[in-house]
A protein has these predicted regions:
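Polysaccharide-binding and catalytic clefts of secreted carbohydrate-active enzymes
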Residues: 1-84, 95-112
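Alpha-helical structural signal in soluble globular domains
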Residues: 3-4, 76, 80-84, 112-120, ...
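Substrate-binding cleft of secreted/luminal carbohydrate-active enzymes
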Residues: 12, 121-138, 143-225
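A structural signal for short, well-ordered beta-strand segments and their strand-loop junctions
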Residues: 13-17, 89-93, 192-194
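Active-site-proximal loop/turn and secondary-structure-junction residues that shape catalytic pockets
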Residues: 18-22, 94-98, 130, 165, ...
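A generic short-segment signal for beta-strand/edge and adjacent turn/coil regions
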Residues: 59-60, 91-95, 160-163
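Substrate-binding cleft/loops of secretory-pathway carbohydrate-active enzymes
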Residues: 84-134
């Protein structure tokens, strides 16, 4: 697909989209298939649930090792692409509600690895539409700040993906999505994204830049009486 893009005249860009270690609904993190166990020494410590504030040092060390393995795999993808497309822009997309779950404060060890820190990628893309569409503005602010602190990308090297509306019956969600887009632009991100075209056309969503210009409150002119 990179070859197709460059043949069409586009600059090479490669997005690593939402890579993470999957977590089951009951909080078990999926680190125990045969390949993963071999990578972690054969008998990695059990983590019954990642949704805990009392993980042991050994459990945290396993999560750190999982993060290093994840970072290594994403770096290998980028390096492979750049062998054929030198200078390719690399982007990492991080879905904040999953990887920065407040109930699992140590999940970031595995799913927001320090190996992703700047300048591992050219652009950090942040997405959090589950928070946006439920009006959880505070979670967005906290999540963005936490991602910036952990990975160190300046806002000028960030993109923000504010969301989409799957069902026509939920079209009211466009309002908080639009507001989140405006907030990201005020933060100074390099680009914002709303998707997808079928839903945008279905609901007639349109973004307007209607902010008023600054005006002088009065003209200080002396008129003859």
């Amino acid at each position: 697909f990179m070859a197709l893009a460059t043949l069409a005249g586009h600059a090479p860009r490669f997005q690593v989209g939402e890579p993470w270690w999957w977590t089951m609904p009951d909080g078990r993190i999926c680190l125990y298939d045969d390949a993963a166990k071999a990578a972690f020494g054969g008998t990695p410590v059990e983590i019954p649930t990642i949704r805990s504030t009392t993980l042991t040092a050994a459990q945290k060390a396993l999560l750190d090792a999982a993060g290093a393995l994840l970072a290594g795999s994403t770096a290998a993808l980028v390096n492979a692409v750049r062998l054929d497309h030198p200078g390719c822009e690399a982007l990492i997309l991080v879905y904040l509600p999953t990887v920065l779950d407040a109930a699992a404060p140590d999940a970031k060890r595995a799913n927001v690895p320090l190996g992703w820190a700047s300048p591992a990628f050219d652009v950090l893309q942040l997405e959090d539409y589950d928070w946006v569409t439920t009006g959880n503005v505070g979670a967005t602010a906290h999540g963005v700040a936490a991602a910036e602190a952990r990975l160190g990308y300046p806002v000028s090297k960030q993109h923000y993906l504010s969301g989409f509306v799957l069902l026509e019956t939920d079209r009211a969600q466009w309002r908080p999505i639009d507001a989140a887009t405006d907030a990201a632009r005020k933060r100074g991100v390099a680009a914002t994204f709303i998707w997808a075209l079928p839903q945008v056309l279905r609901d007639g969503y349109t973004h307007f830049d209607l902010a008023e210009d600054d005006v002088q409150a009065f003209d200080d002119v002396s008129f003859p009486l």
